[in-house]
Amino acid sequence: MAQQYQPGQRWISDSEAELGLGTVLAQDGRLLTVLYPATGETRQYALRNAPLTRVRFSPGDVITHFENWKMTVREVDDVDGLLVYHGLNAQNEVVTLPETQLSNFIQFRLATDRLFAGQIDQLSWFSLRYNTLEHTSRQLQSSLWGLGGVRAQPIAHQLHIAREVADRIAPRVLLADEVGLGKTIEAGLVIHRQLLSGRASRVLILVPENLQHQWLVEMRRRFNLQVALFDAERFMESDAGNPFEDTQLALVALEWLVEDEKAQDALFAAGWDLMVVDEAHHLVWHEDKASREYSLVEQLAEVIAGVLLLTATPEQLGQDSHFARLRLLDPNRFHDLKAFRAESENYRPVAQAVQELLDKGKLSAEAQETIHGFLGAEGDSLLAAVNTGDDEAKARLIRELLDRHGTGRVLFRNTRAAVQGFPERKLHQYPLPCPVEYLELPVGEHADLYPEVSFQSQPEVSEEERWWRFDPRVDWLIDTLKMLKRVKVLVICAHAETAMDLEDALRVRSGIPATVFHEGMNILERDRAAAYFADEEFGAQVLICSEIGSEGRNFQFSHHLVLFDLPSHPDLLEQRIGRLDRIGQKHTIELHVPFLETSPQARLFQWYHEALNAFLNTCPTGNALQHQFGPRLLPLLESGDDDEWQSLIDEARTERERLESELHTGRDRLLELNSGGAGEGEALVEAILEQDDQFSLPIYMETLFDAFGIDSEDHSENALILKPSEKMLDASFPLGDDEGVTITYDRNQALSREDMQFITWEHPMVQGGMDLVRSGSMGNTAVALIKNKALKPGTVLLELIYVSEVVAPRSLQLGRYLPPAALRCLLDANGNDLSSRVSFNTLNDQLESVPRASANKFIQAQRDQLTPRINAGEEKITPRHAERVAEAQRRLAADTEEELARLTALQAVNPTVRDSELVALRSQREQGLAMLEKAALRLEAIRVLVAG
């Protein structure tokens, strides 16, 4: 018979007990809407199978009104489907309490109900529940939460930025690292940590259309974030009233969005906590006019609290364009371009003084005068201490200057010069004769840069005449691969057709094991290709990628890169080299560039090498130089006088050297120091690597797999294959694939094998499995025989596991101060608590299972004796709970007071501190303290131990 639901009825979620007491809001057709006031969250369920249990108290139960007074139930009436409780309050007065007025924080003693109902679980499940609670508590308190689970090597500056930004309330910042330093990973870490902490629950990611796939791959593969990619087709085909409301994470191409007003309306109506905009430097703004893209992002930034802009470095952009990004973040602060220019000039001497302090360890009289002018009299004592060689004072002085830096809190910009760990590059050039078949082709756009595409598109080309049978680059590639033997080689070319043809050529002409990677393949096909390439023993020697197909992938286990052709823009060239040239690459990057002599390919090679120096170094000036010289460059690539060509090369080289000199002298060491974290990032790296070396996760997961009926078998070194067994307990276990998955706990293995799941405490499989344990009832009762000579046979010990927790909105992050913790009580026959003398594991080693029928018979016989002892357990544990709550309140108050004091003082000298930040922080403190006041104890599990 179907459940009858009425608005106002109280129900509890079977799968999300932590939400507290729910209230039925509405029954609409086949949907049921339930509000959970304790957390402020709403859930919708299918009416026929809602995972809900009716809250119905019985005479003798003590219940709580939402105003915190208690009553003992004597009678229960059902009035039109709503329960009304009658009973006595603490003053012995007759009172009535309708269920609509029940406290949202009431806890349920389900363990007791199951124990006396004969639902007794295995000892292994009891241990799993206890260990799950312990690990949950530990992770929620960890400073690494949201930072350690990414499929990437931990890198100091990225971790520093992620923690600094993600721990703010509604962060509004500009990430402007140089190319290759991992802005996308920084943004992903911020998104991930904000989602896990509850500071954000809905995220909008706006990117150029050509980067959509890269973001999709990065978010899914690195962070296990299920991002929904939106385009015109998906938007039109959606049955939902507002397609954007159906997803937590939306990835949208700006080019499509700016053209579709209906999609814009839906996007604004959906509501978002955080907006991330990639390639924000392409948003065009001038004082008198802004582009449609800029205006759209500006309107969104006005209604979305958190904004992350990913952009080129300020030096590349120029000051006006840099100002345009900053005004998106804070239009009140950055409203006047002239004032911004003047302010920037004022900071330059301070940055130079800091550079002097860092380089020389002391300050000249001129530098001291500059700092005095900036900090005033309060900086004099610090300066005096610095002059005596006090390193701590030096660090404090730099910190003070950082805090007051004009854009120090909103701008993060790391440079390769400031970040160590990049490999060298070595260039190998191979001029080859241009075949007559290409010389006879008609001249067309890009025809001479990619002649194989033009040749193959001719209708009369037969199988025997295919381009790879005569192109000398193919012969050269085969010879090079044979010379390198089984060394892994990445080949990148502009077009998918070229990549597929090259795979055919290698198979037909050489038998060299190769695989291909292009935009026509789905993610699973690309994963398989990447895994085949990564396999050291039986894998492909060469992976052939198209330009677009390789976006978002990391192949740094290889260090040989073949540029089979050259892209038409220096940014694309840097993207190609960046597939291997990343922090953590352990070898020199060997760049192999074949090109056809006396062709546009040869001149483009010369342009990149001699004018831009783009092969041997990153080229931060490449975009500006291409824009400046592009109108002259393109005609000269195809034809033109040699002297005119050489003149262009010389001019561009001179201009590049001038721009690079400007960049170097304009380096803001103060900003670099702030962005790098001044040592904080290194500490995070060490902590993550230390966590990686621990065995607690694999040990815990093995017990979890056993409990849920997941079979695991060795795949290879450091890798396991997981498959559902015939005895799989719960089909909702988040295995990821019904057929099975391959996992690894090893970070390095996961980096080279993207087809394997990288299992960390943050992985959805781990979190989902732990949620199933916590939200279910399995393991909250057990009966065991204890073998201990010190105990008289027949002695009954009672082990009670309580959860000390606070039910509150995740955005308050009270889990940092009062994470759900298992408080254990071990009562002997006299009511003494032995838990401090006998640990959980020590006790576990002395226990033997009891058949369920025998256990149930014993419990029923002992029910009258056990009930008062169970009730007495809460009295034993309450002081420990109260101590935890008081400490949590103290820490929360201290942390917020310290941060409020810092920000208030800072606001007086640095206008980038927003009033809204201070208001939100005060509100968060008051709400947090009020919620902690309501923290409760919940009896989570009972184990009855009989000495034998």
Swiss-Prot record:
Could you tell me the Gene Ontology terms of the biological process aspect for this record? Answer: regulation of DNA-templated transcription
* EC number, as in UniProt: 3.6.4.-
What's the family? Belongs to the SNF2/RAD54 helicase family. RapA subfamily.
Q: Which CDD domains match?
A: DEXDc_RapA (cd18011), SF2_C_SNF (cd18793)
Role noted for this protein? Transcription regulator that activates transcription by stimulating RNA polymerase (RNAP) recycling in case of stress conditions such as supercoiled DNA or high salt concentrations. Probably acts by releasing the RNAP, when it is trapped or immobilized on tightly supercoiled DNA. Does not activate transcription on linear DNA. Probably not involved in DNA repair.
- Please tell me where ATP binds in this chain: 177-184
Ranges of residues in domain Helicase ATP-binding: 164-332
Per its UniProt record, what InterPro entries does this chain match?
A: Helicase_ATP-bd, Helicase_C-like, Helicase_RapA, P-loop_NTPase, RapA_C, SNF2-like_sf, SNF2/RAD54-like_C, SNF2_N
Pfam families from the xrefs? Helicase_C, RapA_C, SNF2-rel_dom, Tudor_1_RapA, Tudor_RapA
- Residue interval(s) of motif DEAH box: 278-281
The name this protein goes by in its record: RNA polymerase-associated protein RapA
Q: Which residues form a coiled coil?
A: none
Give the quaternary structure: Interacts with the RNAP. Has a higher affinity for the core RNAP than for the holoenzyme. Its ATPase activity is stimulated by binding to RNAP.
Asked whether the keyword DNA-binding is assigned, the reply is yes
Q: For the Helicase C-terminal domain, which residue ranges apply?
A: 473-627
Which keywords, in A-to-Z order, does the entry hold? Activator, ATP-binding, DNA-binding, Helicase, Hydrolase, Nucleotide-binding, Transcription, Transcription regulation
Please indicate if the UniProt record lists 4Fe-4S as a keyword.
no
User: Species name for this entry?
Assistant: Pseudomonas savastanoi pv. phaseolicola (strain 1448A / Race 6)
Q: Name one GO molecular function term.
A: DNA binding
